[in-house]
Amino acid sequence: MMMSDLSLDLVEEILSRVPATSLKRLRSTCKLWNALFKNPGFTKKQFLKAPKESLVLMLKEYSVCPMIANLSVSAPSIEFKGALNLKNYPPYSEEVDIHEACHCDGLLLCTTMDYRIVVWNPCLGETRWIRWPKNIYSRFALGYEKNKYGRIYKILRCWDRHNSPTGRVDEFEIYEFSSDSWRVLDLVALDCHIASHIGVSFKGNTYWLASDKKDKYGLLLCFDFTTERFTRLCLPPSQDVSKMALSVVGGKQLSLLSQSDSTSKIMEMWVTNIIEDVLMWSKSFTVDIPIRGDYCPYLTSYLVDEEKKVAVCYNENFEKSNKKVYIIGEDNGYYTEIPLVESSYQVWGYPIIFNYVPSLVQIEEGGCIIKE
């Protein structure tokens, strides 16, 4: 039996179980299928039913680059593929330099080097440029409100109106896609310093490392896009949140990398568990980094494979010659340093490594909504 002999409902049911990257390749093969892939009803069904194909992306030299990590014990390695090019808005067509990026449900929220922001679906090649009152000390997060209609995507803007890069945040705004406008969040105040510039998106909310303004202890700060409020959560015992980094494991758990200080070669990996609606931390594994000398690399972005007990980490170092990716595993089963080959100009920004799951989520004028 040919696909053309099947009913449209059955074809839709079959295709809704195909990953987004495969559907992208099918768009040009059939006009009917291409129209189906643009149908919001099909997009919602496919998002919920299709298996999630995770890609590793790295923000490198102002571009988002796919990265393949070979985690074999005998010869671990890293391979970079061609960059995913973000184009300027029409009628311009030049590539845009990306300064920061965060992601949620296959959408990337990017800040450009000229202080513009754009929501980008690399799988579909769609973009939505967002107008905002520019302030270079703003930070952004992408998440979604959960209600009976599904997921309604929003952008949070945190702004230090004193124009000081101290992490002190005073004002908060929400961007709504449906109205293409920003609104101020009233009665929202923080009594902590946000330590990590880029938040981690997890199940629609955004998480940052932070420290209490008065007592200086470390904490996990969560912004709930449904209630539009901040919540404090606990962290594992540690000396300094500036020596920590956050990540997500398989879309199911938060992960924390903890280093005690710049001279310690001991690195701990923690993961979250939810027990009776309370977030709890458990230690996953510990690594004694086999590095020579007194200085241990400051690892600011990473991905972890819980099954293999291995992490792929990036060190924050603005000296071009010292930029490296590390593959580090439990009991020193893995250890590889991979220098990054970059151009001659100095790279300033917030390099990150993250898991990205391509999706058909559309950036619509009426707002981005996924029905649960």
From Swiss-Prot:
Keywords noted in UniProt: Kelch repeat, Repeat
InterPro entries found in the cross-reference section: F-box-assoc_dom_typ1, F-box-assoc_interact_dom, F-box-like_dom_sf, F-box_dom, Gal_Oxase/kelch_b-propeller, SCF_F-box_component
A Pfam short name: FBA_1
Spans traversing the lipid bilayer: none
PANTHER family in UniProt: BNACNNG10540D PROTEIN, F-BOX PROTEIN CPR30-LIKE
NCBIfam families according to UniProt: F_box_assoc_1 (TIGR01640)
Protein name, entry field: Putative F-box/kelch-repeat protein At3g22730
